[in-house]
Amino acid sequence: MTLSEAIRTMADEIVSVLAGNEPTIYIFGSVALDDFRPGWSDIDIAVLTKHEITGQQADTLVGLRQVMLERFPGNPYFRLFEGGMLSLDAFLSGKKERAVYWGTSGQRIDDSWKMDSFGMAELLERLKTATT
């Protein structure tokens, strides 16, 4: 499976879990900048939804990387996805609500998710472009 196929497969799974919540998936960082390097890069992802993620959705999403690794043994990409999933409102306002975090140190359900300033600038520019 190629990097592009892995991203599409993961995106399809996320959309399936968040059905009815109108998820928008953003890939940013080295993949978006065409600078992905196997063994060095991760796959930065932000998933923004119309409404707060439900407890059941969060429970499914928090373990999705592991599920995908079990389904596709030996795939080098699924463990590299890192980022957050939360409502667009919580992302923009910083309000506390259920969020899913995937990172190098593991994954968890939390009450917020913040991205680094470079990723934030890139994502806000994309949001601005998408809404104007």
Model regions: which residues?
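Conserved NTP/Mg2+-binding pocket subregion across the NTase superfamily
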Residues: 63-132
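Helical scaffold of the NTase/Pol beta-like nucleotidyltransferase catalytic core
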Residues: 1-26, 57-58
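Generic, low-specificity signal for short hydrophobic/alpha-helical stretches with a mild N-terminal bias
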Residues: 7, 25-28, 43, 65, ...
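Short helix-terminating capping/connector loops at secondary-structure junctions
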Residues: 19-21, 39, 74-79
